[in-house]
Amino acid sequence: MAAIKKKTVFFCQNCGYESAKWMGQCPGCREWNTFVEEPDAKGSSSKKGTRRPGEASKPVRLRDISMEEHRRLGTGMKELDRVLGGGIVRGSMVLIGGDPGIGKSTILLQVCRHLADSGFCVLYISGEESLQQIKMRAARIGEISDDLLLLCETNLADIKEIIEEQKPDVCVIDSIQTMYNEEVASAPGSVSQVRESTNVLMMLAKGLGVSMFIVGHVTKEGAVAGPRVLEHMVDTVLYFEGDRHASYRILRGVKNRFGSTNEIGVFEMRGSGLVEVENPSEYMLSGRPEDASGSVVACSVEGTRPVLIEIQALVCQRNFGIPRRTATGTDYNRVNLLMAVLEKRCGVALGACDAYVNIAGGIRMNEPALDLGILLALVSSVRDYTIPDDVMVFGEVGLSGEVRAVSQAENRVQEAKRLGFHKVILPSANMNSCRRIEGIELVPVKAVREAIAESKK
């Protein structure tokens, strides 16, 4: 008698669209070659009732809902609290992604240490390390409270039972790709497993009021591995960025139901763990060369925080038939657009040159306010002149060569003044909001040509 073939379905890894057959292009998100085959998960945990534990299935008046139990918890790190919107919201689900070795587990262990020392019940669940390995890493970051609960488990049924029994205030899952739901007939890390496991954990977090952190692996493109629907299910998505071989780390929010997604947190990796960088501008500008052409300081605003960064450019005669153009730390297409503006509007010949643009320190910034800085760095390199070290610039550049206004100009100027800069080149449209700032020279410009002339003085 022939064995009964298990029914399979196809899922889009980008948006979670489900299909009975493979498709080249997803009808949901229009992406190509994103479908993977998985066993049909129907009849599993997603079908066995979706009522969250501890919640009644009846409507409640909005005015009758108490907010006293939902005060935010401090993580002990101001940088992390800033990105989260002021701390951890009770019952929230936070997904943290990043490259291997970037520091995801380290920062969560430091958060667990602070919360456990503050008297909260904290459960750290690892599917990747043994208890001894976790303790070794904990010893590296300092003394940890004996009340911190550790568990090495990947079976979701056992994890659910322990969470319901312990009722922790905060729970860490490291990582979601190692969790295994017995009711889903596929391997750990598959689309079905990740989706179903996240759904079960979300019900626990919302029903029991457990604040949950989930660690997610990332793909080579930098997105969290697994279905895109994973990012839609959680409340907050954070990405840890930075070069593993350098000491700095950038924590950036890309989704936050309880705060802004424009904030960043800056950390430095040391032997004792991650340390907050309270003054990122000073940190980013350390080691800047003196009297070097192709270098300029610009200002980018991430959320409410102005950050001064060094933009470097190198322009030289091409070695091969086709000019080589690269951009590190900023948008490549934007750099090409700005080079076209330079050639057309300012008469700077770049067609026969190789051009390299870099945001020093490895940080990635894409704000339009950096346009003027990129242009001046390119001109400084191709004409081989030095922009004074005490000059800071910002402004968006249009296709006609005009310098357009940007937001939070006053905060940018104040940051430059605080760090000892004496001159700021800024859009003339922003001059009124900055005029009252004393102790620093403000040079308003309307066009790129004016900015180039002022940068030589």
Regions found by a protein language model. Give the residues of each.
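Peripheral, non-AAA+ core regions of ATP-driven protein-machinery
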Residues: I4-N14, E18-R82, V89-L95, I102-L109, ...
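Conserved RecA-like ASCE P-loop NTPase motor core of nucleic-acid helicases/translocases
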Residues: V122-S126
